């Protein structure tokens, strides 16, 4: 059963002079997750997901005119963020499957393509984990904890990225007088690339074209041929709206990257290899502190896999400050300690699938980062040859170290 939230469920949110919530109810797909403890075991949680605000229809109040155009905000409706909030209405999404999102119990499948009106449409869905209230994001505090999930990456060819990562978004999605919709409608996204998120930033009109910066922990960026994980610290806490040159100095957009192929383990990850991507994989991420407490300094990030009842250790060393010492930007922006501070404050799980029209995902799976050929990441090639491209995440759980998996 999906969680349905109409405007009535937000009666406590201020609506005066604010971007209105429309008449179409939001129908969040449930995604059962698990909170685990070394003594109590794992307890199921009635969580759900929401698509990013940019997937929602935002239109003029009392009319069918969109508040955005192909080039951004409609200036006649949104000359400034206050006027925009008064003129525009956000509608809920009732059928997530039409956006490439399918759920079943504790599993979620994200699809890159879908045939609509006889044409193949590229979808690239990105969803965020909501708390059990369905109104706020689920913010996980993971210092001296572990985060574990199962993933089927077998339908992700070269050039694709089925990602699961953490973003230091605000729990409410930036809910305010100008943004009553908040997390319920997928507002507030940010990451360490500080990209311009489009017409909306923290749920308000992005009239300045600002970038949305925040700390990011990439737990899993992968396809069937290559995988990485990467922390991305920032000098700021939470979402920061950057402009101009500062967007390139606030966060470490590249991060300290752990890629087994790039580190020399070329027969470690892939079809039929040690970590066999032809089969489902359990991925465990552990965030170990210097004093083994939830208030300590992040000292090490460990990765291990479980497949067919066997624990598979990481291909080389774990990620430590020494491992990341060659990344000058990472160290200058605070390194693991700064990343750990964000993990201590709490971060929101993000699930996505996407291709890379600009770089063809070479940074992930080609040019020394993986075994893929130079043209395999071309989105046109992927669409023509792999129309069923998809990723499935399931059994998402977190808790005490060594409490989320068994063999």
UniProtKB/Swiss-Prot annotation:
This is Probable endo-beta-1,4-glucanase celB. Keywords: Carbohydrate metabolism, Cellulose degradation, Glycoprotein, Glycosidase, Hydrolase, Polysaccharide degradation, Secreted, Signal. It is found in: Secreted. PANTHER family: 1,4-BETA-D-GLUCAN CELLOBIOHYDROLASE B, ENDO-BETA-1,4-GLUCANASE CELB. One of its GO terms (molecular function) is cellulase activity. InterPro entries: ConA-like_dom_sf, Glyco_hydro_7, Glyco_hydro_7_sf. Glycans are attached at residue 136. One of its GO terms (biological process) is cellulose catabolic process. Belongs to the glycosyl hydrolase 7 (cellulase C) family. Its EC number is 3.2.1.4. Pfam families: Glyco_hydro_7. It comes from Aspergillus fumigatus (strain CBS 144.89 / FGSC A1163 / CEA10). Has endoglucanase activity on substrates containing beta-1,4 glycosidic bonds, like in carboxymethylcellulose (CMC), hydroxyethylcellulose (HEC) and beta-glucan. Involved in the degradation of complex natural cellulosic substrates. The keyword Cell inner membrane does not apply. Residues 1-18 form the signal peptide. The active site is at residues 216, 221. It catalyses: Endohydrolysis of (1->4)-beta-D-glucosidic linkages in cellulose, lichenin and cereal beta-D-glucans. One of its GO terms (cellular component) is extracellular region.
């Amino acid at each position: 059963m999906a969680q349905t939230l109409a405007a009535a469920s937000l009666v406590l949110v201020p609506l005066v002079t604010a971007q209105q919530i429309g008449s179409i109810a939001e129908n969040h797909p449930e995604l059962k997750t698990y909170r685990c403890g070394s003594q109590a075991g794992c307890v199921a949680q009635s969580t759900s997901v929401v698509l990013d605000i940019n997937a929602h229809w935002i239109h003029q109040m009392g009319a069918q005119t969109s508040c955005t155009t192909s080039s951004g905000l409609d200036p006649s409706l949104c000359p400034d963020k206050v006027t925009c909030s008064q003129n525009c209405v956000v509608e809920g999404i009732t059928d997530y499957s039409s956006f490439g999102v399918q759920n079943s119990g504790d599993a979620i499948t994200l699809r890159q393509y879908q045939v609509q009106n006889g044409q193949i449409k590229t979808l690239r869905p990105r969803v965020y984990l909501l708390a059990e209230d369905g109104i706020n994001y689920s913010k996980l505090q993971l210092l001296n904890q572990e985060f574990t999930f199962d993933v089927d990456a077998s339908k992700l060819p070269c050039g694709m990225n089925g990602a699961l990562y953490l973003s230091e978004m605000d729990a409410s999605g930036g809910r305010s007088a100008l943004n009553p919709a908040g997390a319920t409608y997928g507002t507030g996204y940010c990451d360490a690339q500080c990209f311009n998120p489009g017409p909306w930033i923290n749920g308000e009109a992005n009239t300045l074209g600002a970038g949305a910066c925040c700390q990011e922990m990439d737990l899993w960026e992968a396809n069937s041929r290559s995988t990485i994980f990467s922390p991305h610290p920032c000098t700021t806490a939470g979402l920061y709206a950057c402009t101009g040159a500062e967007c390139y100095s606030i966060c470490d957009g590249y991060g300290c990257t752990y890629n087994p192929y790039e580190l020399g383990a070329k027969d470690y990850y892939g079809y039929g290899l040690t970590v066999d991507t032809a089969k489902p994989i359990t991925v465990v991420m552990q965030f170990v502190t210097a004093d083994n407490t939830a208030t300590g300094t992040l000292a090490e990030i460990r990765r291990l896999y479980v497949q067919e009842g066997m624990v598979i250790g990481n291909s080389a060393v774990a990620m430590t400050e020494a491992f990341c010492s060659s990344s000058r930007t990472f160290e200058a922006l605070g390194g693991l300690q700064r990343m750990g501070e964000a993990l201590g404050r709490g971060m929101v799980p993000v699930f996505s699938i996407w291709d890379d029209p600009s770089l063809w995902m070479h940074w992930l799976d080609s040019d020394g980062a993986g075994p893929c050929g130079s043209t395999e990441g071309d989105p046109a090639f992927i669409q023509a040859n792999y129309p069923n491209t998809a990723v499935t995440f399931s059994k998402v759980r977190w808790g005490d170290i060594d409490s989320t998996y068994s063999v």
